[in-house]
């Protein structure tokens, strides 16, 4: 009985010691992940608009040990209602309330440790385009042209292979990237219009920086940036303007229930 009790105690002590070691290794690894992370500080959404119908805005903030900082900012018409912390101390969520008379502009959000700003972010409140709230979506009266941008038309071969992108174009690979882009779509708007279409549904154009199998666009790694192999955010705006000038609606394909394996927060999850 004595021997059995001693063995049990020893087992518990060994298990406890192992758990302490594992916990320490996880903590060290977590800090190492953030220190080596390509995105050491981030605020999403990176900007917003004045005059939105919903007065609530939540910001996701990421930075090393951001949870230990105090938030400091001052801007007329914006109030910090609540700060949420996650299990991971590298995350913070800010609930902001926007006044109906909020004016466009910018302000510094400072994340303070004592009297020193550990991080600072210049947040832009843009002016909303006139008539934005009156936009009409697509309906049963529309004839929709669905296209996959990588497979549609290559209007700018110079962006087929871009610095920092893990996959390069290879038209001989049936599941690889083939080089289609926003420029190719813009050059073929007349073709789509002549078919009798009234709307274009474009598969996601946002960044899919994965080593393979992401030509379809549904493995997003940045929800706020057009994939450079398709073009730029400005190119997308120009595409929409060109389409509208021809009476074509543009349906933005958004994916909210998953992301690509190389999305920045996958290596350091909030929970």
PLM features: what roles do these ranges have?
Residues 11-24:
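Bacterial N-terminal signal peptides
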Residues 2-14:
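Bacterial N-terminal signal peptides that target proteins for export
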Residues 255:
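Conserved strand-turn element in the central/C-terminal portion of the radical SAM core barrel
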Residues 25-29:
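Sec/Tat signal peptide C-region and signal peptidase I cleavage site
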Residues 30, 52-115:
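Immunoglobulin-like IPT/TIG beta-sandwich domains and homologous Ig-like subdomains
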Residues 30-68, 121-130, 134-135:
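Beta-strand/beta-sandwich contexts
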Residues 115-229, 233-248, 258-259, 264-267:
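N-terminal structural segment of carbohydrate-active enzymes
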């Amino acid at each position: 009985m004595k021997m059995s009790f001693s063995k049990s105690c020893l087992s518990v002590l060994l298990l406890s010691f192992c758990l302490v070691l594992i916990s320490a290794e996880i903590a060290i690894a977590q800090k190492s992940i953030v220190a080596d992370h390509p995105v050491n500080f981030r605020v999403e959404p990176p900007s917003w608009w004045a005059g939105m119908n919903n007065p609530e805005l939540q910001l996701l903030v990421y930075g090393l040990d951001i949870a230990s900082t105090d938030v400091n900012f001052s801007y007329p018409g914006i109030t910090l209602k609540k700060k949420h912390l996650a299990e991971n101390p590298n995350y913070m969520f800010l609930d902001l309330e926007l006044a109906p008379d909020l004016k466009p502009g910018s302000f510094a959000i400072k994340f303070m440790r004592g009297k020193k700003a550990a991080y600072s972010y210049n947040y832009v409140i843009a002016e909303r385009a006139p008539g934005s709230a009156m936009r009409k979506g697509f309906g049963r009266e529309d004839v929709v042209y669905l296209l996959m941008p990588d497979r549609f038309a290559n209007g700018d071969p110079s962006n087929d292979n871009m610095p920092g992108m893990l996959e390069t174009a290879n038209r001989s690979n049936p599941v690889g990237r083939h080089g289609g882009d926003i420029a190719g779509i813009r050059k073929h708007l007349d073709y789509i219009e002549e078919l009798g279409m009234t709307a274009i549904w474009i598969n996601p154009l946002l960044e899919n920086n994965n080593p393979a199998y992401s030509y379809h666009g549904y493995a997003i790694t940045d929800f706020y940036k057009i994939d450079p192999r398709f073009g730029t955010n400005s190119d997308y705006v120009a595409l929409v303007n060109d389409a509208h000038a021809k009476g074509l609606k543009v349906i933005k394909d958004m994916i909210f229930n998953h992301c690509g394996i190389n999305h920045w927060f996958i290596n350091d999850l909030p929970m």
